[in-house]
Design a protein with these regions (language model features):
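Catalytic core of membrane glycerolipid acyltransferases/transacylases, capturing the structured
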Residues: 6, 19, 32-93
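Non-catalytic C-terminal accessory region of glycerolipid acyltransferases
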Residues: 1-6, 97-207
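N-terminal membrane-anchoring alpha-helices
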Residues: 1-23
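Short gly/ser/thr-rich secondary-structure transition/capping motifs
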Residues: 19-27, 93, 150-153
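Structural motif corresponding to alpha-helix initiation and N-cap regions
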Residues: 26, 74, 96-99
Length: 207
């Protein structure tokens, strides 16, 4: 079976799963219907962030993202992620193979979801972001759609009590970065757009 089949199947399963485990409160969903390709840049609280985003991507768009290379050693993850074209990345270094794969996905007209912070927040607040998203957006000449998510950190505690929890998602309009700006300036613009949509306690260093 083709990877397209597996992606459509997984997309449907994720949408159903998120409806079961939480109550989604979404603002700005129309911005995800922006013509692809584009980048989605969001804060990173838990492993529930990627399925939350995937459940909201319109079926007309194809989404991919990155996963830490360590999960490639876990057979179920490797089999699934390879079939839906997840991009493996080596943490702690500039992974040029992964960067090339992200650019190739955008060139194919896909949507790529990334977290500018690079890793999950241990405090819940935004951490200092890296310049990767800004660099990719400039290189591929694609816009960035900022996304703010909170409440996902309560999914697992609620599931243990057999309760659904409230998950909030705010999606901002596409940002077209100014090519004259530095990557630092572009990263600040993206992160402040995310922070502006988050409740104050989640804004961290961008509060």
């Amino acid at each position: 079976m083709s990877n397209e089949f597996w992606y459509r199947l997984f997309h449907g399963v994720v949408r159903l799963l998120m409806r079961i485990v939480c109550r989604m409160h979404v603002e700005g969903i129309e911005h995800l219907s922006h013509p692809a390709p584009y980048l989605v840049a969001g804060n990173h609280l838990t492993q529930w962030d990627p399925p939350t985003l995937m459940s909201l991507i319109p079926p007309t768009h194809r989404l991919t993202g990155i996963a830490a290379d360590k999960w490639r050693k876990v057979l179920p993850f490797r089999l699934l992620f390879d079939r839906i074209n997840v991009i493996w990345v080596k943490r702690g270094e500039v992974d040029r193979v992964a960067l090339s794969a992200v650019l190739a996905a955008l060139k194919r007209g896909w949507v790529v979801g990334l977290t500018p912070e690079g890793t999950r927040s241990k405090t819940g607040g935004l951490q200092q972001a890296r310049n990767g998203v800004a660099w990719i957006a400039a290189k591929a000449k694609v816009p960035v759609i900022p996304v703010a998510v909170w409440g996902v950190e309560n999914i697992e505690p609620s599931l243990k009590r057999l309760h659904r929890t409230d998950v909030h998602v705010r999606i901002g309009p596409a940002i077209t970065l100014d090519p004259a700006d530095s990557h630092d300036a572009s990263t600040e613009r993206i992160m402040h757009a995310i922070a502006a949509m988050l409740p104050e306690k989640y804004r961290g260093v961008y509060g």
